[in-house]
């Protein structure tokens, strides 16, 4: 009899532990949505920690430090992408969560095959910092050159609105600002 009770207790405990793990995974998945509030509307992005864990850690860490709050989209190119994440607003600034550049996490399992992909802007291999871009069209020439780490799940109309802004030398004439960025709760 004691053996049966022990076996049943083990089964129940195992089930409860597995249930807790599933709930934790679901909570983590929910928390990997980041909202970027702009002066033109909100963009929601699902991060891809399974594809680019260090890049997602960097981005989410900067989001949680309010690093992107008040930063402009400094580069907008029609039929290509919108770019932000540089606190100087020049395209030449921005540091990673760790204060230095970090390595690419390019994977052949993801590609620039559609609009709405979030990727790291860089100045060459392994020069990732804080700058990112969102594609507005498929951009296959960027495959294996920039780390893809997220995808727009809501607000692609806002991305397109930003893309359509009047620019001078790829810089919006009127400021398009990230008011704040935060994990969706």
Identify the role of each PLM range:
Residues 2, 6-7, 11, 18-185:
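Cyclophilin-like peptidyl-prolyl cis-trans isomerases
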């Amino acid at each position: 009899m004691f053996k049966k009770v022990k076996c049943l207790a083990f089964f129940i405990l195992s089930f409860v532990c597995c249930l807790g793990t599933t709930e934790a995974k679901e909570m983590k998945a929910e928390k990997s949505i980041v909202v970027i509030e702009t002066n033109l509307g909100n963009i929601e992005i699902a991060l891809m920690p399974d594809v680019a864990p260090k890049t997602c850690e960097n981005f989410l860490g900067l989001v949680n430090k309010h690093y992107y709050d008040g930063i402009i989209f400094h580069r907008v190119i029609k039929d290509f992408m919108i770019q932000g994440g540089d606190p100087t607003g020049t395209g030449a600034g921005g540091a990673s969560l760790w204060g230095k550049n970090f390595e690419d996490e390019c994977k052949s399992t993801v590609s620039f095959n559609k609009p709405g992909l979030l990727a790291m802007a860089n100045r060459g291999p392994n020069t990732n910092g804080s700058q990112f871009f969102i594609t507005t069209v498929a951009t296959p020439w960027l495959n294996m050159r920039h780390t893809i780490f997220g995808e727009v799940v809501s607000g692609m109309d806002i991305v397109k609105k930003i893309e359509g802004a009047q620019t001078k030398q790829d810089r919006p004439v009127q400021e398009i600002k990230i008011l704040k960025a935060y994990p969706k709760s």
